Amino acid sequence: MEVIELSLPATNRLATEYIEGTFPVHEAFHPCSFKERLHELHKRTYARDALVHHLLAYHKQFQASEETMANIEKLRHRESVVVIGGQQAGLLTGPLYTIYKIISIITLAKQQEQQLRVPVVPVFWMASEDHDMAEINYVHVAQRGKVKKYVYSPLAKEKRMAAHIELDADALKQWIDDIFKTFGETNVTNELRTYIYECMATSKTVADFFATIVLKLFAKEGIVIVDAAHPHLRAIEREWFMTLAHEHEAITTALQTQQRHLAQLGYEQAIDVSPMCAHLFYDDGQRRLLYYDDAQHCFYTKDGVYRFTPNELRQRIESEPQSFSNNVVTRPLMQEWLFPTLAFIAGPGEIAYWAELKRVFEHFHWHMPPIVPRLSLTLVERHIAADLADVHMTVAEALTNGTKQALEEWMRNNQPVAFDETFHEAKKQMAYIHEQLRQLGMQVDPHLEGIMLKNAERVETQIDYLQQLITRRMLQKHDVHVRKYERIELSLRPNNMPQERVWNVLYYMNRYGLDFVDRLLHVDYRWNGMHKIVYL
């Protein structure tokens, strides 16, 4: 695989400036070297034995690789640290950027283990407590030259968290089969489909299905998964839930202070929470955000189902920690409390909202871990590279501007001389002639004006139709060349979005082999914030 680098803007201004190195990092983060961070972490203590005990039991049910189990054991050692990042439990792993985030975690962990000479464990935080199924219940595929969204219908109306939703084996198998039909048959299709069937057969829930695939894909690399909704993990988190509940007002104050500071610097707000938000969810089968009524001195849910005094909430956390989970503000705090975090791998959106957490971390006398932007890739297949060469377009041009403008320019250069001008002149002359006819009609009967104006519109519409008809015939005449532009757009910029946010990794595994992810993992990436163009 050949790699070239390209500078592309991120999805928000703050992340773009952070990646480019123009953001004033001291305003929102605690910049430090990995060596300095390691020294800081060694001064702190963690519930290592309890965490290792849980992770070993959790991964055993998935028959995780020896490499993963060995990495978990490393966490017992006081000098060990982690590189961590997370994502929702998307079906079939979701868009490519989830795979790229895991590759980023593993790659940075390996590099820092060599440089720091301490165990550095790659950890993936699976946000299995998320209940927004619309974000994970589909896969995009290419069908008839368009982006097609294949939704797994049993999840469409689900309100529960991914960790609690059991799979419908028959419906899931049919959904998988339909997706594979769009890929086309290759010499590895049957093997890959069987691979996914096996993952499905050993999975009970949506979260299990995700974890099984990831643990198989990255078995040799020893990736460790944290199931955020697991009841045994929640039991370990009990103590910190207590602290978060007690400190919710201070958390909100610190958050809002930092948000105002960033607003003064000209940055948009990324986290939107109510001033009364308690930053914890309570889940009795339905996940509800807790708020705090200062006048009544109690926690409550907006639907009025629950009200807790501070003491009652503490008792609930003590007796049923599995019913509580974090919001966008407290999840990073829980991660920091649980794991000796050498670095956090972040996507563009995460960079923006972590920037608002600096003072929240400081409230707990912590420094934020180094925030490392995840690797961002575009995969260029050989036939797409050939199409680019044929239409004299670079990857940079395709990713930055898309192909629409280039195609329109090519069509203008290959259409009859003065094509647009001829139709423009025809409309102008027809309007003049029709004006004469209308004046004649008005002399006969002034009431004809409305009818004649509508007739003028119909005449112009017919000229537009004729222009569109000739344009379509020109496109058909140049069909081979036009399709090259369309293929480029569909592959590299589907729906005018980054490739990594649309396509799924299974398409590429079906074309390039079951070891595709492993080969992608072993490309020599540079951590410089540049977008990577990978030629397959």
Swiss-Prot record:
EC number, as in UniProt: 6.-.-.-
Top class in the EC scheme: ligase
Function: Involved in bacillithiol (BSH) biosynthesis. May catalyze the last step of the pathway, the addition of cysteine to glucosamine malate (GlcN-Mal) to generate BSH.
Entry similarity comment: Belongs to the BshC family.
The protein's name: Putative cysteine ligase BshC
InterPro entries (UniProt xref): Bacillithiol_biosynth_BshC (IPR011199), CC_BshC (IPR055399), Rossmann-like_BshC (IPR055398)
Keywords: Ligase
Highest taxon listed in the record's lineage: Bacteria
Organism: Anoxybacillus flavithermus (strain DSM 21510 / WK1)
Gene Ontology MF annotations: ligase activity
The UniProt record lists the keyword Transcription regulation: no
